[in-house]
């Protein structure tokens, strides 16, 4: 089992209640970084819905207090179950205190015309051709599981135009790209 799979491991207690365990090796500052929390909430929702025709369509996530080491409950509440779309709220809690919560909409695929056409072409430089960022002690603890690749950087306040950072990131030990793993990745790129 890869480190990310271990971090996103859930034990089902009831159909809507799961247990997870936060560990210090995923810390960023005072607690587990938000991507792990988001990944756990996505995994609990996916397990609760138990329908592969449904996929996440929208989501907001709120971090209420530091997610410190130890066991936590992940609780799913169905707000509305529909034939094509369902709305849920997922909570990560410890001793009846909310650590983080997420509102989600999960829906079936719909056939529809695209309403947005990008006005510029994105050219992705292969990661083998850009800087592989070395791990340094000042990085958050969880970065030992992540590899960053930096293509370009224009820091603020240096007169270099609009600030931007462009590159890639991935887990060093890869895992299939599931919705929970993708959720964990959403918060790992340092400008996030």
Which stretches of residues belong to each language-model region?
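Terminal targeting signals and extreme-terminal segments of soluble enzymes
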Residues: 1-192
């Amino acid at each position: 089992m890869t480190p990310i799979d271990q971090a996103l491991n859930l034990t089902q207690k009831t159909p809507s209640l799961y247990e997870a365990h936060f560990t210090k090796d995923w810390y960023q500052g005072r607690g587990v970084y938000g991507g792990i929390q988001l990944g756990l909430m996505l995994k609990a929702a996916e397990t609760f819905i138990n329908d592969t025709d449904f996929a996440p369509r929208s989501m907001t996530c709120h971090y209420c207090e530091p997610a410190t080491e130890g066991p936590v409950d992940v609780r799913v509440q169905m707000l509305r179950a529909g034939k094509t779309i369902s709305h849920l709220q997922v909570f990560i809690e410890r001793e009846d205190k909310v650590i983080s919560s997420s509102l989600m909409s999960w829906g079936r695929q719909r056939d529809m015309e695209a309403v947005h056409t990008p006005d510029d072409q994105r050219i992705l430089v292969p990661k083998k051709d850009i800087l592989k960022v070395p791990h340094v002690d000042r990085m958050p603890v969880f970065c030992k599981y992540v590899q960053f690749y930096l293509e370009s950087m224009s820091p603020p306040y240096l007169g270099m135009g609009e600030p931007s950072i462009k590159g890639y990131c991935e887990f060093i030990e890869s895992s299939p790209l599931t919705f929970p793993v993708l959720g964990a990745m959403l918060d790992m790129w340092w400008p996030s």
